[in-house]
Swiss-Prot record:
PTM annotation (N6-acetyllysine): residues: 144
Organism annotation: Homo sapiens
Location in the cell: Mitochondrion
Disulphide-bonded residues: none
Molecular function via GO: structural constituent of ribosome
Protein name: Large ribosomal subunit protein uL29m
Transmembrane region(s): none
Subunit structure comment from the entry: Component of the mitochondrial large ribosomal subunit (mt-LSU). Mature mammalian 55S mitochondrial ribosomes consist of a small (28S) and a large (39S) subunit. The 28S small subunit contains a 12S ribosomal RNA (12S mt-rRNA) and 30 different proteins. The 39S large subunit contains a 16S rRNA (16S mt-rRNA), a copy of mitochondrial valine transfer RNA (mt-tRNA(Val)), which plays an integral structural role, and 52 different proteins.
GO biological process: mitochondrial translation
InterPro entries with a match to the protein in the record: MRP-L47_sf, Ribosomal_uL29_mit
UniProt entry keywords in alphabetical sequence: Acetylation, Mitochondrion, Ribonucleoprotein, Ribosomal protein, Transit peptide
The organism's place on the tree of life at top rank: Eukaryota
Lineage: Eukaryota, Metazoa, Chordata, Craniata, Vertebrata
Family classification: Belongs to the universal ribosomal protein uL29 family.
Length: 250
């Protein structure tokens, strides 16, 4: 009885394997039991399993396309762009928004610099070069707003105007400089390196300081005279603008 039961079980297993082989195409290798264990029990379309690719052949750009302009703008002479961000607009935003906006502007700047370099290489005019100036102005305004917030927070917490404490001192050439304080391991009266610094000027330096002040005054006066001459030339060249300016003042 045991032998008959074992033979009946073997026949059922062999019939089940034959029926499973009939469902799979001839491309399946001999070890069909391994593949059948990976598939779900209810697989109406088993032939689609062999259509999958084991190797992914798409291009791995890794974000390099962000260094190039939108393909829609390729070949165009002018590209529309908005105005630059102002400090007043950026002051109304949170720190998180400013952080995100900084990286957006940085990516845009890298893209425009790549476009500018490629235009130089091909000896072609860059489409809408004012976009780069707007991005640079926006980044400068954002940096200024962040610096204002850091200064305000530091004044509130420590009362210091500068990030690193210091004092106005005079060097050996008589110039007034901002000396930044630094932490030392040993006291100042035992520190030879600190004692070599001279925060005073000898009397013979006063003559050269006077010459330097005279030089700065001459440069300033020369610049003002040049601006006045340019203004007179423009008034003679465009008299209607002078009349319009006088009427607006009245």
């Amino acid at each position: 009885m045991a032998a008959a039961g074992l033979a009946l079980l073997c026949r059922r297993v062999s019939s089940a394997l034959k029926s499973s082989r009939s469902l799979i195409t001839p491309q399946v290798p001999a070890c069909t039991g391994f593949f059948l264990s990976l598939l779900p029990k209810s697989t109406p379309n088993v032939t689609s399993f062999h259509q999958y690719r084991l190797l992914h052949t798409t291009l791995s750009r890794k974000g390099l396309e962000e260094f190039f302009d939108d393909p829609k703008n390729w070949g165009q002479e002018k590209v529309k762009s908005g105005a630059a961000w102002t400090c007043q607009q950026l002051r109304n935003k949170s720190n998180e928004d400013l952080h995100k906006l900084w990286y957006v502007l940085l990516k845009e700047r890298n893209m425009l610099l790549t476009l500018e370099q490629e235009a130089k290489r091909q000896r072609l005019p860059m489409p809408s070069p004012e976009r780069l100036d707007k991005v640079v102005d926006s980044m400068d305004a954002l940096d200024k707003v962040v610096q204002e917030r850091e200064d305000a927070l530091r004044l509130l917490q420590t009362g210091q105007e500068r990030a690193r404490p210091g004092a106005w001192r005079r060097d050996i050439f008589g110039r007034i400089i901002w000396h930044k304080f630094k932490q030392w391991v040993i006291p100042w009266h035992l520190n030879k390196r600190y004692n070599r610094k001279r925060f005073f000027a000898l009397p013979y330096v006063d003559h050269f300081l006077r010459l330097e002040r005279e030089k700065r005054a001459r440069i300033k006066a020369r610049k003002e005279n040049l601006e006045r001459k340019k203004a007179k030339i423009l008034l003679k060249k465009f008299p209607h603008l002078a009349e319009a300016q006088k009427s607006s003042l009245v």
